[in-house]
Curated annotation (Swiss-Prot):
UniProt-listed Gene3D superfamilies: 3.30.420.40
Name of protein: tRNA threonylcarbamoyladenosine biosynthesis protein TsaB
Record-level GO BP terms: tRNA threonylcarbamoyladenosine modification
PANTHER family noted in UniProt: TRNA N6-ADENOSINE THREONYLCARBAMOYLTRANSFERASE, TRNA THREONYLCARBAMOYLADENOSINE BIOSYNTHESIS PROTEIN TSAB
One Pfam family recorded for the sequence: TsaD
Family, as annotated: Belongs to the KAE1 / TsaD family. TsaB subfamily.
Keyword Cytoplasm: yes
Listed GO CC annotations: cytosol
Keywords for this protein: Cytoplasm, tRNA processing
Annotated localization: Cytoplasm
Function: Required for the formation of a threonylcarbamoyl group on adenosine at position 37 (t(6)A37) in tRNAs that read codons beginning with adenine. Is involved in the transfer of the threonylcarbamoyl moiety of threonylcarbamoyl-AMP (TC-AMP) to the N6 group of A37, together with TsaD and TsaE; this reaction does not require ATP in vitro. TsaB seems to play an indirect role in the t(6)A biosynthesis pathway, possibly in regulating the core enzymatic function of TsaD.
Length: 210
């Protein structure tokens, strides 16, 4: 595939940008806190320069559509929509929780991922993700906003071994169990958006337009 993809994530406290070009991914990630608006555009410019391309070379834009922090999500959506309109190219919105699951696969090659992302007081965004034999993730239908005191009951019902990722696990008390293994993956990375745009035959696959 010769198409060029720009991926953006500003859904939580970290900002990240990635460009896919000729089977190479150029990426940049920074801690943004409340500075998403200030940092994300210079980051995009820097990654484009590293890839030796301009905005006009892009064929697709993908972004993290949440769940996450409202302001950060709106920034990603706004940038993606602006580029789509000005360049007349399609955009793809990918779940933040599925991006975290993909990051766990990239780093640890694990297929059963429990994602918990910090939400409102006493709540987390929850998702149960499974990577199937076609190398695609299932689990977006399990995503929900859940009270922390309800999570232990959900975990007791799960079978097999699960990997825990996301910053929401800092808040969750749980029993020690061989079924669960926590990994130090707190934030999504835009480079993990790229695989969602490919199907088995390596053609771009529209998951959702915003």
């Amino acid at each position: 595939m010769s198409d060029i993809i720009l991926a953006i994530d500003t859904s939580i406290d970290h900002c990240s940008v990635a460009v896919y070009k000729k089977k190479v991914i150029y990426s940049l990630s920074e801690n943004c806190k409340k500075e998403h608006t200030i940092k994300i555009l210079p980051m995009i410019k820097k990654v484009l320069m590293n890839a030796k391309i301009t905005l006009k070379d892009l064929n697709y834009v993908a972004f993290s559509k949440g769940p996450g922090k409202f302001t950060g999500i709106r920034i990603s959506i706004g940038i993606a929509q602006s580029l789509s309109l000005s360049l007349k190219i399609p955009i793809f919105g990918i779940s933040t929780l599925s991006i975290l699951a993909q990051k766990a696969w990239r780093k640890y090659k694990k297929k059963q991922i429990l994602v918990a992302v910090n939400a409102k007081i006493g709540q987390v965004y929850w998702g149960e993700y499974l990577r199937n034999n076609t190398l695609l993730w299932t689990g977006e239908k399990t995503e929900s906003l859940i009270k922390i005191n309800k999570i232990e009951d959900k975990m007791k019902k799960l079978k097999k071994k699960w990997i825990l990722v996301g910053d929401g696990w800092k808040k969750i008390k749980r029993e020690n169990s061989l079924k669960f293994e926590q990994k130090k993956i707190l934030y999504p990375n835009a480079k993990d958006i790229i695989p969602f745009l490919f199907s088995e035959n390596s053609k771009p696959r529209i998951l959702s337009f915003f």
